[in-house]
């Protein structure tokens, strides 16, 4: 508690302050493609951003929920290291956090042949796979696992001939080119089996079946 006393001996009501000597934790930096840098930190803390050489990128203040976001005047180049520290309102600065800009878009997803019941394929590991039809109408979204495999089951099987387009969006927000396939929900014709003496069975069927 602090009071003020004038020369005549009059004392003011006390003012109270609580000492804060604890540094905030390191900020969390979300994956970034260099266009926007965001994350979380102690609410009200000033987040200072520099590159690996200590050159300033910018400063921003975390809101009451601890969220912060900063947009550089020019997008940061792929591979730029971003270093962030948080300084609380009393001047305590916490440890550093760092991330590396990923500004490279993932490749187009591979879509396996589908009969419309399930759509599956491969994409960059961890990427969000966004599926639309040939007119751009949404079909659904899913995320590729650590091996790059993904699968999506529509609530209603897609009709024969439906065009399925897929793009992959990585955690940094980069969206790659489109992959595409067409639903084949028509069963093949009955195979033709040639006469056989039992030593060899052969015949004809739908190509690729």
Please annotate each region the language model reported.
Residues 1-209:
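Ser/Thr-rich low-complexity repeats and stalk/linker segments
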């Amino acid at each position: 508690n602090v009071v003020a006393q004038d020369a005549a001996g009059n004392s003011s009501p006390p003012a109270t302050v609580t000492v804060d000597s604890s540094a905030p934790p390191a900020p969390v930096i979300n994956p970034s493609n260099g266009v926007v840098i965001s994350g979380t930190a102690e609410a009200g803390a000033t987040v200072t951003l520099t590159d690996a050489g200590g050159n300033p990128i910018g400063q921003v203040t975390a809101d009451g929920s601890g969220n912060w976001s900063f947009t550089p005047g020019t997008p940061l180049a792929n591979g730029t290291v971003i270093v962030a520290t948080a300084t609380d309102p009393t001047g305590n600065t916490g440890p550093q956090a760092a991330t590396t800009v990923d500004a490279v878009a993932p490749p187009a997803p591979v879509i396996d042949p589908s009969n419309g019941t399930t759509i599956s394929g491969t994409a960059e590991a961890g990427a969000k796979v966004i599926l639309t039809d040939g007119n751009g109408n949404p079909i659904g979204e899913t995320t590729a696992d650590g091996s790059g495999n993904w699968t999506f089951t529509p609530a209603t099987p897609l009709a024969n001939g439906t065009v399925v387009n897929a793009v992959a969006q990585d955690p940094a927000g980069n969206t790659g080119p489109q992959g595409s396939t067409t639903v084949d929900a028509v069963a093949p014709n009955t195979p033709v089996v040639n006469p056989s003496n039992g030593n060899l069975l052969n015949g004809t069927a739908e190509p690729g079946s």
